[in-house]
């Protein structure tokens, strides 16, 4: 019996030793893969003359790779550097609208994707034919070509929304159901959030998104603490990096409530996207509704595009007059993909997505969309 007991103890010791060795071996492999990816991404960014920060997600693990400078004397990747997300904010606004749809069920403030926006905008011409779903899918027929032109005025939230309503009443409108990608739709949605809650968009954003997820590097323009630095944007020109430095003016961004005021980092934005449909921000059923609205006419729905038969999702954002660009593409389960926030480029949307696609191909061959 004593010998048998010793054998059992020896076997147990061997099992424990083996169990201890396997994770260490796996950790070594994972570290090697991470180092390989970091080298690959940095070399690619250098070759393509882009600077910024990219979150690379592999099997649910996030690795942030940064290259170049945020401004003179400050590198991308520093803890205090944040970036304009441009149109990537639209998904945030859509998520808050969906939260309110779910919360207000059974109350006098209940609304659905089919509710006409004349409830909140009785003075807007044609509002009795436009639904909340039309705004979320850019099928309202509304657009203002000059919506992103800096008017040189620092608008309050209400002032930005009211300007849009007044301008729309002066402009020609296409039939409801016509697809026009326009900030107008999401500015009106921001106004609805204000009217339904009786609180500012900023207050809702902080409560419903930032505080709920514990995001520490995510703000709206005008609300960025002094210790954080919004990266400057640059062009690559005449074989030189960091040319034509540009920032986005606060007056211009104040016009774009709900559409393009977001300041964040790739890792924080990934935290937001990956929380959708988990119960942290939206229940799975609410998230499914968010991505399958009846008014959807293209692959765009609620702030992003759904492609490859629902296997991947993506969005791109940029504002003219500066060199920033933001882009993400993730698998539907959020386990693999990238979030890019770029502050130097000399290429347009298609070429930047092409750079991203090279990273995506290294992650998961032939899984992601090229466009």
Task: Describe these PLM feature segments.
Residues 149-226, 256, 260:
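Catalytic-site signature segments of enzymes, centered on catalytic residues
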Residues 84-87, 102-147, 195-234:
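Active-site helix/loop module of the DD-peptidase/beta-lactamase fold
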Residues 293-332, 339-344:
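Short, Gly/Ser/Thr-enriched beta-strand-loop segments that form substrate-interacting elements
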Residues 54, 60, 82-113, 186-194, ...:
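Active-site SXXK
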Residues 2-26:
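Sec-dependent N-terminal signal peptides of Gram-positive bacterial secreted proteins and lipoproteins
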Residues 346-371:
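Short, gly/Ser/Thr-rich active-site loops of penicillin-recognizing serine hydrolases
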Residues 224-296:
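Penicillin-binding protein/beta-lactamase superfamily catalytic region
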Residues 37-83, 105, 109:
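Short, conserved catalytic-motif segment at the N-terminal edge
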């Amino acid at each position: 019996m004593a010998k048998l007991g010793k054998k059992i103890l020896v076997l147990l010791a061997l099992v424990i030793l083996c169990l201890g060795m396997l994770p260490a071996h796996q950790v070594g492999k994972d570290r090697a893969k991470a180092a390989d990816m970091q080298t690959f991404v940095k070399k690619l960014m250098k070759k393509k003359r882009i600077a910024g920060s990219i979150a690379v997600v592999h099997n649910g693990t996030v690795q942030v790779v940064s290259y170049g400078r945020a401004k003179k004397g400050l590198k991308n990747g520093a803890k205090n550097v944040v970036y304009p997300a441009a149109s990537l904010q639209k998904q945030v606004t859509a998520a808050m609208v969906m939260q309110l749809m779910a919360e207000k069920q059974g109350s006098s403030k209940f609304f659905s994707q089919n509710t006409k926006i004349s409830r909140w905008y009785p003075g807007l011409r044609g509002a009795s034919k436009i639904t909340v779903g039309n705004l979320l899918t850019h099928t309202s027929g509304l657009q203002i070509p000059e919506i992103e032109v800096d008017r040189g005025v620092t608008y309050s939230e209400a002032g930005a929304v009211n300007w849009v309503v007044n301008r729309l009443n002066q402009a020609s409108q296409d039939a409801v159901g016509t697809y026009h990608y326009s900030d107008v739709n999401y500015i009106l949605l921001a106004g609805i959030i204000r009217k339904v809650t009786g609180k500012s968009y900023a207050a809702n954003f902080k409560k419903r998104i930032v505080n709920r997820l514990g995001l520490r590097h995510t703000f709206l323009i005008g609300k960025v603490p002094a210790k954080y630095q919004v990266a400057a944007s640059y062009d690559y020109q005449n074989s030189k990096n960091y040319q034509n430095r540009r920032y986005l003016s606060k007056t211009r961004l104040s016009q774009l409530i709900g559409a393009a005021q977001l300041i964040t980092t790739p890792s924080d934005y990934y935290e937001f996207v990956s929380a959708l449909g988990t119960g942290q921000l939206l229940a799975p059923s609410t998230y499914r509704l968010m991505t399958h609205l009846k008014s959807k006419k293209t692959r765009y729905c609620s702030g992003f595009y759904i492609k490859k038969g629902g296997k991947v999702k993506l969005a791109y954002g940029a504002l003219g007059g500066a060199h920033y660009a933001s882009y993400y593409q993730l698998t539907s389960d959020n386990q693999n993909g990238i979030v890019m926030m770029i502050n130097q480029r000399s290429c347009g949307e298609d070429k930047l997505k092409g750079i991203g696609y090279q990273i995506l191909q290294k992650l998961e061959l032939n899984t992601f969309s090229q466009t």
